[in-house]
């Protein structure tokens, strides 16, 4: 199930805020979530939305903190809810400025999966050629290759 809001930001840009997105346990890992996101990206680009936004949650039944950046959502390190995790990131990845900087390598993804935390206001940039779109395309290609 999912809930979304269509909004306009302070600069007059249209965006979609994804409030919630939950899948049943039997649906996770099937590719359904990435397919739903791919469809939302295509629809939003066609309707001239500037970006998608969500709070990428971490909890007993929530893995958005990892899944959404893996598929292209990004945020500055200051958007990580936990100050102690922000400090650990700066120590482990001193060159990193955003969550996607951490997620750019397998080592970073592995570290984030264990140590990562809730991200406030993560954004998926819908502009052609954006890092979000490039990351999403690479993720989808990796899924196809894995089978």
Predicted regions and their residues:
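Conserved aromatic-histidine-acidic binding/catalytic patches
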Residues: 24-28, 32, 54-60
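General structural concept
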Residues: 21, 35-39, 53-55
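Conserved acetyl-CoA-binding loop-helix of GNAT-fold acetyltransferases
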Residues: 28-44
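Intrinsically disordered, low-complexity, charge-dense segments enriched in Lys/Arg
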Residues: 79-147
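Conserved GNAT acetyl-CoA-binding A-motif
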Residues: 42-60, 67
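Conserved active-site alpha-helix within GNAT-family acetyltransferase domains
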Residues: 57-80
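Conserved acetyl-CoA binding element of GNAT-fold acetyltransferases
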Residues: 2-4, 12-26
